[in-house]
Design a protein with these regions (language model features):
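N-terminal organellar transit peptides
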Residues: 1-130, 135-150, 154-243
Length: 243
């Protein structure tokens, strides 16, 4: 019988290198396609979630607008809570607002994550972005960011009946209650900022800079990426040591 040369198996290190390359490619695609960083390569595994542009809910945003789709974010938050390898959550926001119910739904889920969490407002955290900004255990904002506080808006057909006005009031009450319950600002003060008529042209509301947002108690601290990560690392370390 002819001699058959046994098929050579790839060296273990070569297989490992191939897996590392594939993992890096998948991570790069995830960052490029959706702006998600599953876990950092630092001292602890921090999941970075971005909320940018318009928060898209039951209706699609126009094609020329960047958006964050809530049906994409919800499974990620479930995975963050379920995956034991993920130790913390960092939510980075630069949003103009969007669908009220979708924004509140995401804010409720973020507030329900049992792992250390932090939010960082860059650029803007406007409208329904406010509940998202205060939904984590600790909130940070850069000095140059702004936050717009205003009443609930609605586009499309509106029925001119008392029930419609009551619906808007109830939605606004839920927003005020959530923000006041997850930050240092009172419901009364938040409502005053929301109904301010002396700042915006032909509109109602208040624009807060980074330092103003902290002074009002809406955001916990002025800070940037390093500050948010240091907070998360400290919380994770404290949890592991039991302090």
């Amino acid at each position: 019988m002819p001699n058959r040369t046994p098929k050579q198996q790839p060296a273990p290190h070569a297989a490992k290198d191939a897996k590392d390359v594939e993992r890096m490619r998948l991570e790069h695609d995830l960052i490029t396609d959706s702006g998600i960083v599953p876990a950092t390569k630092g001292r602890h595994a921090i999941y970075c979630l971005t909320v940018i542009g318009t928060i898209e809910g039951h209706s699609l945003a126009p094609d020329n607008q960047k958006s964050t789709k809530y049906e994409h974010v919800i499974p990620q938050l479930v995975d963050i809570e379920e995956d034991p390898a993920i130790e913390g959550l960092l939510v980075i926001l630069n949003t103009v607002g969007g669908d009220v119910e979708a924004g509140l739904a995401l804010a409720e889920l973020i507030s329900g994550v049992s792992k250390p969490s932090a939010t960082l407002v860059l650029g803007g955290g406007h409208s329904i972005g406010l509940p998202l900004a205060v939904s984590a255990r600790k909130s940070f904002i850069v000095p140059t960011a702004t936050m717009t506080v205003h009443p609930v808006r609605h586009s499309g057909m509106v029925l001119g009946v008392p029930q419609t006005l009551r619906y808007f009031e109830q939605m606004q009450e839920r927003i005020v209650s959530f923000v006041a319950g997850h930050s240092g600002i009172s419901a009364k003060r938040f409502t005053q900022l929301m109904h301010n008529t002396g700042e915006l042209v032909m509109d109602m509301g208040t624009v807060l800079g980074g330092e103003q947002a902290v002074e009002e108690g809406l955001i916990d601290a002025i800070g940037n990426l390093g500050d948010a990560l240091r907070y998360l690392y400290a919380e994770i370390d404290a949890g592991k040591t039991g302090y």
